[in-house]
């Protein structure tokens, strides 16, 4: 089966059965992918505000009802506790485990958030002739924690995380124009060029994901990243926070075109 052209529900079922375990970049071409955050209800309001205050890094797509494992729009038949290829479990700000299923942790008190992912606009970039290096090299996209502070909300505070894609400056200008249409999945780049200006000292050592080749005629282009809540969790220290593992997204039933202005 060609996973690029597979239906989201088919891929989610394969993930649930343990038949798909890798990063999801390039899967279900033309459909929205989302970052995942699952929290106890007592933390939900502060995190909701955190998303609204930081739309470039945490563009909110959907929120579940308390205790509900599905979503009203982005996954009506989904089970958020079993249909993400890899989950991370944080307790009091410490990453304690990565696993394939969190059904036993999902209580009636949990609230789930879906946050826009830049994988969603990659298809539009490819159609415009802009290379996606991590796809070419079969890597997870490189992600870096910056020195740019997020706008805090309650216990949620810290610096934002970005994803990086190298390209020529001409392509970067075109990519900026294209991603202007995708405000619900991070929109335009946060930074283009010198990574030290945003606190990144070595592009070969990403905080999440894998490094990619950057050619001499290329510049790094940085977009806001929905992994930001995971770096923020180190400061927020909620009793329990469940997220997707970086690059292992929730594949929704919604076409990319519905998020393009």
From Swiss-Prot:
Coiled-coil regions, chain positions: none
Highest rank taxon of the organism: Bacteria
Class of the enzyme per the UniProt entry, highest EC level: lyase
Single GO term (MF): lyase activity
Pfam families for this protein: D-Glu_cyclase (PF07286)
Claim: Transferase is one of the keywords in the record: no
EC number: 4.2.1.-
Lyase among keywords: yes
NCBIfam families from the UniProt entry: PRK05463.1
The family this protein is said to belong to: Belongs to the D-glutamate cyclase family.
HAMAP family for the chain: Hydro_lyase
Protein name listed in UniProt: Putative hydro-lyase SSP0308
Organism of derivation: Staphylococcus saprophyticus subsp. saprophyticus (strain ATCC 15305 / DSM 20229 / NCIMB 8711 / NCTC 7292 / S-41)
């Amino acid at each position: 089966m060609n996973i690029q052209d597979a239906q989201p529900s088919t891929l989610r079922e394969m993930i649930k059965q343990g038949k798909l375990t890798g990063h999801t970049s390039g899967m279900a071409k033309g459909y929205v992918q989302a970052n995942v955050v699952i929290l106890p209800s007592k933390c939900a309001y502060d995190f909701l505000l955190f998303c609204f205050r930081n739309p470039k890094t945490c563009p909110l797509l959907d929120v579940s009802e308390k205790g509900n494992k599905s979503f009203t729009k982005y996954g009506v038949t989904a089970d958020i506790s079993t249909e993400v290829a890899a989950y991370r479990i944080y307790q009091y700000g410490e990453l304690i485990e990565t696993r394939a299923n969190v059904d036993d942790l999902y209580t009636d008190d949990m609230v789930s958030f879906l946050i826009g992912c830049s994988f969603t606009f990659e298809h539009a970039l490819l159609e415009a002739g802009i290379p996606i290096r991590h796809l070419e090299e079969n890597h997870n996209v490189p992600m870096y924690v910056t020195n740019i502070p997020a706008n805090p909300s309650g216990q949620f505070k810290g610096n934002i995380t970005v994803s990086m894609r190298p390209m020529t400056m001409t392509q970067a200008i075109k990519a900026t124009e294209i991603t202007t249409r995708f405000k619900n999945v991070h929109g335009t780049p946060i930074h283009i060029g010198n990574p030290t200006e945003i606190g990144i000292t070595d592009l070969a050592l990403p905080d999440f994901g894998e490094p990619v080749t950057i050619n001499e005629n290329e510049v790094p282009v940085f977009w806001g990243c929905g992994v930001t809540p995971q770096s923020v969790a180190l400061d927020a220290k909620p009793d329990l926070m469940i997220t997707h593992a970086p690059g292992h997204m929730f594949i929704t039933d919604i076409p990319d075109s519905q998020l393009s202005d």
